[in-house]
Amino acid sequence: MSEKPKYYITTAIAYTSGKPHIGNTYEIVLADAIARYKRSQGYDVFFQTGTDEHGQKIELKAEEAGITPKEFVDKVSGEIKRIWDLMDTSYDKFIRTTDEDHEKQVKKIFKKLYDKGDIYKGHYEGMYCTPCESFFTESQLVDGKCPDCGRPVQPAKEEAYFFKMSKYADRLIEHINTHPEFIQPVSRKNEMMNNFLLPGLQDLCVSRTSFKWGIPVDFDPKHVVYVWLDALTNYITGIGYDAEGNSTEQFNKLWPADLHLIGKDIIRFHTIYWPIFLMALDLPLPKQVFGHPWLLQGDGKMSKSKGNVLYADERSEERRVGK
């Protein structure tokens, strides 16, 4: 009897800055529908989701709450998992970026890329958006504010490690051009090519010293690994990747991922940063990254700051009561 074909599907890991709203829940439910369909078609499906638990925003939220960052993320991650379970989603793995095995591999990955010459130490000076955890140049701002979320930005200057993005840019462009299915829908591919890749990539900041809640850089512990090199690698650490060459049978079976299902607001990180990290690690790229649209409420994106948020668990309870 022939072995079932594998299908590895992931969602973006949810950021633990607060309770997820129904727009966040949309993604896990959509991924669950795909996973269930693939199982019905005879695939051996592995469905991974989880929580992204480091960063300055969480450090500040924990301070406001009067608890440690770990206590804060334990509470929020537990709430996210509770809601995902309430939605009866059939995930196989719920990874947390505070998991010991994930943190261990992130340290190894950072060191491997540093030893290879892809990461170097420098200084960052520019504008920083704390909610988005992103750096921007003055020219990238829109009306002096964050181009992604529209919130105010603050000047930032600090020592940091950087990843040489431009080293792999041509190779990524070639991959995108020869694999039309890689970025979907096509409008997202055009956006990435025209707005980021073709104009040229700047080197990427991959460490911070202005806050402490993160994975320390082993050989320079005043630095913590910056969000994307930590968060994105969950897709490989969660299935047993080892940067020293001792990856598990599960990793060798499942990677590359068949589908990364993500929101359109983080398509750049998954179709530029992530594949370049994988190239540097000599790993194959995911087969497809799909950037789904937002779930809108009223005249725009659902947002806690706009006060237009609906919560999946509350709506679910209303439906049960109304039966």
Segments and roles (model prediction):
Residues 43-44, 67, 89, 118:
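Short glycine/serine/threonine/alanine-rich loop segments
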Residues 51-57:
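Short, charge-patterned binding micro-sites
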Residues 60-64, 108-109, 136-139:
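Short low-complexity, flexible loop/linker segments enriched in glycine and/or proline
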Residues 2-49, 101-105, 155-323:
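Structured secondary-structure scaffolds
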Residues 61-74:
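A charged helix-plus-loop insertion that forms the helical arch/lid used to bind
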Residues 72-128:
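A broadly conserved sequence feature marking short terminus-proximal activation segments
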Residues 116-169, 173:
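Cys/His-rich short segments
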